[in-house]
């Protein structure tokens, strides 16, 4: 089972990630990370879509979880009709908690091929000047797409609870 998570940016970086599930654990396998301010060139939605297709590279992706504010990119993916798109759940603080739990429990793992993700983990910080818990809005693009994936895909899991009814004698 494979999936993709997307944090879409125009002037800020776009971070797209290919996830693969094996033996109940999700692995962040590959990433597409494009920072237009560093390259000096913006990309269109179609160019980011081409990057998405290259990232997927023919794998059987079940769903693509996308930043819910990226309406134009969601529309491009839907127009091509190749993938199921889910707008991501976007509660920041609950999502960060869920990612922390998923990492601690080993539900997700980050492969060493995801260098921008690894770099961002070292730079991600809470904003101490705010009166509420919020991260600083820089070096958070891969962190956001991980949060989208965990909040949207891992939250779909069942807790294996069920009710059984039997006939009384």
Give residue spans per PLM region:
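Anionic group-transfer/hydrolysis microenvironments
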Residues: 7-9, 69, 146
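Acidic, Mg2+-coordinating catalytic module of metal-dependent nucleases/exonucleases
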Residues: 136-158
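Structured catalytic/translocation cores of nucleotide/phosphate-coupled proteins
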Residues: 2-5, 11, 97, 102-103, ...
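Residue-level detector of short, conserved catalytic/binding motifs and their immediate flanks
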Residues: 14, 62, 143
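Conserved helicase/translocase motor-coupling segment
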Residues: 1-21, 25-27
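Mg2+-dependent endonuclease catalytic cores in nucleic-acid-processing enzymes, primarily RNase H-like
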Residues: 17, 23-137, 156-157, 163-169
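Aromatic side chains
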Residues: 8, 124-126, 148
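Active-site-proximal flexible loops/turns
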Residues: 14, 74, 151
């Amino acid at each position: 089972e494979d999936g993709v998570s997307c944090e879409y940016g125009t002037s800020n970086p776009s971070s797209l990630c290919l996830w693969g599930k094996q033996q109940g654990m999700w692995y962040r396998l590959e990433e597409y990370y494009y920072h237009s301010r560093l390259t000096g060139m913006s990309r269109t939605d179609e160019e980011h879509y081409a990057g998405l297709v290259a990232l997927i590279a023919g794998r059987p992706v079940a769903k693509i979880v996308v930043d819910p504010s990226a309406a134009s990119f969601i529309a491009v993916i839907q127009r091509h009709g190749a993938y199921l798109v889910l707008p991501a759940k976007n509660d920041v603080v609950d999502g960060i908690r869920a990612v922390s739990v998923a990492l601690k429990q080993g539900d997700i793992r980050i492969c060493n091929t995801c260098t921008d993700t690894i770099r961002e983990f070292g730079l991600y910080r809470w904003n101490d000047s705010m009166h509420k818990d919020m991260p600083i809005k820089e070096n958070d693009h891969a962190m956001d797409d991980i949060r989208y994936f965990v909040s949207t895909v891992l939250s779909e899991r069942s807790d294996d609870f069920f009710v059984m009814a039997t006939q009384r004698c």
